[in-house]
């Protein structure tokens, strides 16, 4: 099994590591999340200069043509620094939809602008009643002449307040939970009929409730084919789930390492608490959970993501297993730090909150375990032996 990075991946890893080290020390991050904007535009410009915004995009549009392993490298390091800029919403989620469904005109006009940092996008798909079901869409789009008129409500749209454009899912035909009949629309966030209510989330990131009232959208702003967006949405959300899992693995490493160091330095009754055998066992269990989380992340990254059956199974297996690791490592870190683990001034509680949020993002452990079991029992996907183990 060869898990070594290629030379290009090593350079990418070193570059992102250097960015986090130089621009995301703890005090700097605290100032960023406490600001009114909740992110730093200078960092976004630096992402563009470093080429990070172009990692997953095709070279034909100015991107680097990176794969899932390259996104894993970026997101894992972002997790270690708790980077709050909207990389996942813009580059991976919305950018992935544009790459997958966009016309040549749309891709040529939007993707280079994302790569240069001039455009930020967010994907508005979740609704109050939908939970994790991507097909549950009540927001409607009715054709009226050359325009569609959209009405509805979208919940917890990450990065919307920082975005210049939204991609909105709406139902153009069919029943509320039908997979067919869902269409995507690209809209400017300043459009009349669109209202954003922005707020900080528990993990200090930013999200928005999006109110859509008689929003007129030209037929030219339809992304992909009318009524046929569901399969692409599921695919890009799966790829985004792997990216979120990568971020979680970076967070778990920080929690594991910082807790081990704290236990070595914390003195009780004249000796380090790390000499206590019960604590040693807990630290070893944290390490095991982290290593298993990283291993199953590699499994998902190296799966054939173009094969929808294999992709679904690999993604749900990884999300369910990493969700379990998040719970154990996160809770253990808080417990072993004692009172220090819950104070806002110390980093551990912030890493725990972000990890917990990732645990429910794109589906929690129970959801993905059920999805995985359904796929397995249905005979969907090939055997585990067909999954490549090479990171490259």
Task: Indicate residue ranges for each PLM-predicted region.
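A short, Trp-centered hydrophobic/proline-enriched beta-strand micro-motif
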Residues: 117-126, 168
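Alpha-helical interface subdomain recognition
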Residues: 1-85, 101-106, 113, 117-118, ...
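Short Ser/Thr-interspersed hydrophobic loop/turn segments at strand-loop and sheet-helix junctions
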Residues: 51, 74-79, 170, 187-191, ...
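Flexible, small-/acidic-enriched active-site or ligand-binding loops
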Residues: 136-138, 156, 188-219
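Long, acidic (Asp/Glu-rich), low-complexity accessory segments flanking structured domains
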Residues: 213-231
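Short beta-strand-to-turn element immediately C-terminal to the catalytic PLP-Schiff-base lysine
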Residues: 100-102, 142, 168-171, 186-188, ...
């Amino acid at each position: 099994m060869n898990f070594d990075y290629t030379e290009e991946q090593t350079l990418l890893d070193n570059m992102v590591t250097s960015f986090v080290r130089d621009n995301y020390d703890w005090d700097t991050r605290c100032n960023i999340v406490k600001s009114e904007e909740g992110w730093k535009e200078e960092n976004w410009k630096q992402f563009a200069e470093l080429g990070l915004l172009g990692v997953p995009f095709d070279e034909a549009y100015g991107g680097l043509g990176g794969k899932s392993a390259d996104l894993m490298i970026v997101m894992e390091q972002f997790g270690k620094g708790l980077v709050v800029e909207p990389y996942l919403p813009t580059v991976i989620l919305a950018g992935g939809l544009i790459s997958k469904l966009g016309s040549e005109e749309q891709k040529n006009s939007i993707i280079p602008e994302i790569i240069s940092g001039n455009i930020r996008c967010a994907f508005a798909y979740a609704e109050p009643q939908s939970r994790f079901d991507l097909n549950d869409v009540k927001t409607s789009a009715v054709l009226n002449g050359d325009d569609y008129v959209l009405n509805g409500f979208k919940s917890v749209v990450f990065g919307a307040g920082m975005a210049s454009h939204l991609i909105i899912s709406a139902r153009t035909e069919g029943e509320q939970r039908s997979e067919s009949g869902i269409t995507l629309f690209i809209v400017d966030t300043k459009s009349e009929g669109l209202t954003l209510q922005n707020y900080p989330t528990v993990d200090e990131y930013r999200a928005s409730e999006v109110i859509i009232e008689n929003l007129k959208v030209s037929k030219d702003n339809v992304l992909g084919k009318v009524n046929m967006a569901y399969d692409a949405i599921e695919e890009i959300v799966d790829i985004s789930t792997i990216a979120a899992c990568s971020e979680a693995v970076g967070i778990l490493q920080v929690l594991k390492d910082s807790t081990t160091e704290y236990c070595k330095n914390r003195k009780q009754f004249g000796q380090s608490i790390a000499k206590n055998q019960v604590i040693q066992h807990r630290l070893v269990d944290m390490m095991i959970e982290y290593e298993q989380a990283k291993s199953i992340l590699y499994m998902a990254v190296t799966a054939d993501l173009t094969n929808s059956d294999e992709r679904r199974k690999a993604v749900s297996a990884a999300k369910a297993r990493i969700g379990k690791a998040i719970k154990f490592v996160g809770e253990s870190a808080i417990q072993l730090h004692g009172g220090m683990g819950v104070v806002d001034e110390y980093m551990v509680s912030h890493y725990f909150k972000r990890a917990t949020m990732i645990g429910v993002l794109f589906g929690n452990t129970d959801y993905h375990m059920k999805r995985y079991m359904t796929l397995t029992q249905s005979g969907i996907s090939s055997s585990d032996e067909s999954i490549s183990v090479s990171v490259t």
